[in-house]
Amino acid sequence: MSVTTLTVCDDSTVARKQVLRALPADWPVSVTEAGNGHQCMEAVRKGLGQVLVLDLNMPEMDGYQVLHALREEGLKSNVIVISGDVQQEAVRRVRELGALAFLKKPFDQAELRQTLGRLGLMQLPGQAAQSHRPALNTHVSFNEVFRETVNVAIGRAAALIAKVLGVFVQLPVPNVNVLEVGELHMALADAGRCKQLTAVCQGFIGGGIAGEALLMFHDSEIADMARLMQHQTSESSDLEMLLDLSSILIGACLSSIAEQVDVVFSQCHPQILGQHAGIDELIRVNQQRWKKTLAVEISYGLEGHDIRFDLLLLFTEDSIERLTHKLAYLMN
């Protein structure tokens, strides 16, 4: 039987399953899954990647590095990028590196099928092999599903920040963990003791989900941030600038998460911790709600600048059950 070889490369099991579900049922295809760029390159070198569906932000070897390696090694593969990094510069870079198409996460199944058809990828000369598709009935953990949800959200937020600052935002793979109350208090207390940090806090609630967002800046980088935003530097204007930036970043992240889990969040006004409230006060007010906390850590970097800022999303214990219910369809 003549089949097309397809490699699906994404560090998220959830994202790979979504791609597999979207493939046309009548397409004779042999699918290889890759969890990082190294595995992807191994598959393409073996001739298993006539078509490559590629994520960008992955540990060990990311999608940009894969595209560079394909070019350097002279390997031919028809690449469709599907990514949560939706910055205009990200789209431009992958096109320049040879990608045939760019789809934004979460992608529409019909859009992927149309893209495969438009590019003629379902009519490629096949190889003599058995059609093979991985099973779709594997269970995925809540942490994995929520990490992919957050991945989409931070990508949208980065696209907004990139426009505001006129820079390329380097996106991390988010860390998702459930913390016991003592672990959370220790982490927050450590942040509170650091004299070189300025933290902005913003509460949110909606649809049975509640929590706090903390955005932390290193004081040494605030003047550089102000220059990028063309603010006049003074203590009051710097704090105003941080509040503006925090509103954009936190607001975009939360609105994307809310959209994906089908709720609407109400957000409190952002506060500068230490000026409007302290870390100790934040812990005291929330100690009843924060017995167990779903914590998401994201560290953004700005390319070409020595600037990093860290976003911490903290969801209450009650929110975990609600989020699990909302995302159950992705876990099975």
Across the structure, where does each feature detected by a protein language model lie?
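Two-component/phosphorelay signaling modules centered on CheY-like receiver
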Residues: T13-T32, E72
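Helix N-cap/capping motif at the beta->alpha junctions
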Residues: E33-E42, D62-V66
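Active-site beta3 strand of CheY-like receiver
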Residues: G47-V53
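Active-site residues of response regulator receiver
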Residues: D55, S83
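Receiver (REC) domain active-site loop signature in two-component systems and cognate sites
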Residues: M58
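A Lys-centered signature of the CheY-like receiver
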Residues: K105
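Composition-driven recognition of glycine/serine/threonine/acidic- and proline-rich low-complexity segments
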Residues: A129-V140, E144-E235, M241-N332
